[in-house]
From Swiss-Prot:
Protein name: Phosphatidylglycerol--prolipoprotein diacylglyceryl transferase
Signal peptide: none
Subcellular location: Cell membrane
Spans traversing the lipid bilayer: 21-41, 54-74, 88-108, 176-196, 202-222, 234-254
Top-level taxon of origin: Bacteria
Protein EC: 2.5.1.145
Pathway annotation: Protein modification; lipoprotein biosynthesis (diacylglyceryl transfer)
Organism: Staphylococcus saprophyticus subsp. saprophyticus (strain ATCC 15305 / DSM 20229 / NCIMB 8711 / NCTC 7292 / S-41)
Keyword Signal among UniProt keywords: no
GO biological process, one term: lipoprotein biosynthetic process
A single GO molecular function term of this UniProt record: phosphatidylglycerol-prolipoprotein diacylglyceryl transferase activity
Family stated for the protein in its record: Belongs to the Lgt family.
This protein's GO CC annotations: plasma membrane
Membrane topology: Multi-pass membrane protein
Length: 278
């Protein structure tokens, strides 16, 4: 097995600036997602600048809202440490906040450019879930987003590389590698979406992304020890996962009943709103 001792969250330093693995890995996920989506955009016929605008601005505002979302639910801490609020490189962003910010930004751009949001959502959805799967390794590098304590033998029985086991040893205890579970789930989701997309109607791939990601996140979140809590034992991420599953299912049903959406591979660029009504 591959062996590696403790991984320093800081990849390298440029003078007074510390560059963390967390940021590097997040950036890698975004770039890889862009290149994958680019191939689909070419096939459909969207202009390349459209994809750049949507991914760039959705990523920017997604990160901003993800941080605001996290800070809001950790306000008792940040009100005492306001100087740490912009320190996003230390971790502390909430994916669901990022999804909200990214979705809203993407919809606004689609409206401005007269693009069908469901069609572009189908293009980007596989890239999004792959990027999320890659991004979880940023949590690993930061030694965060893990589950409860376990024994070393438990981790060894998972047959995972030694470097993961070694870096799940935090403050004298071994922890459940929940980042890995979610990463594997997301990568599997990416493969499934890519394989199914050409057979689905426009909008279905995006909805399946919401459903698939949320199912995995719901169960993984139940193992984590750092969940944002709403009240009592209600985990915000689990509540949001349920909401997104419902949204995904409802949109799929409504679009099948009310609209005659073409298949993903059968058409070129569609406008906003598309002429799909039965």
């Amino acid at each position: 097995m591959m062996t590696l001792s403790y991984i320093d969250p800081i990849a390298f330093e440029l003078g007074p600036i510390s560059v963390r693995w967390y940021g590097i890995i997040i950036a890698m996920g975004i770039l890889l997602g862009y290149f994958i989506a680019q191939a689909s955009v070419k096939r459909i016929g969207f202009h390349q600048d459209t994809l750049v605008d949507i991914i760039f601005w959705s990523a920017i505002f997604g990160f901003i809202i993800a941080r605001i979302y996290f800070v809001i639910f950790q306000w008792p801490y940040y009100v005492q440490h306001p100087i740490e609020i912009p320190m996003i490189w230390q971790g502390g962003i909430a994916i669901h906040g990022g999804l909200i910010g990214g979705f809203v930004t993407g919809i606004i751009i689609c409206k401005q450019k007269n693009i069908n949001p469901f069609q572009i959502g189908d293009v980007i959805a596989p890239s999004m879930i792959l990027g999320q799967g890659i991004g979880r390794w940023g949590n690993f590098m930061n030694h965060e987003a893990h589950g409860g304590t376990v024994s070393k033998s438990f981790l060894e029985n998972l047959h995972i590389p030694d470097f993961i086991i070694n870096n799940m040893y935090i403050d004298g205890k071994y922890y459940q590698p929940t980042f890995l579970y979610e990463s594997i789930w997301d990568v599997l989701g990416f493969v499934i979406l890519i394989l199914l997309r050409k057979h689905l109607r426009i909008g279905d791939t995006f909805c399946l992304y919401l459903i698939w990601y949320s199912i995995g996140r719901f169960f993984v979140e139940g193992m984590r020890t750092d969940s944002l809590m709403l009240a009592g034992d209600i985990r915000i991420a689990q509540l949001m996962s349920i909401i997104l599953i419902i949204i995904g299912v409802v949109i799929m049903i409504v679009r099948r009943v009310k609209y005659d959406a073409p298949r993903y591979k059968a058409v070129g660029p569609l406008s906003w709103p598309s002429k799909e009504v039965k």
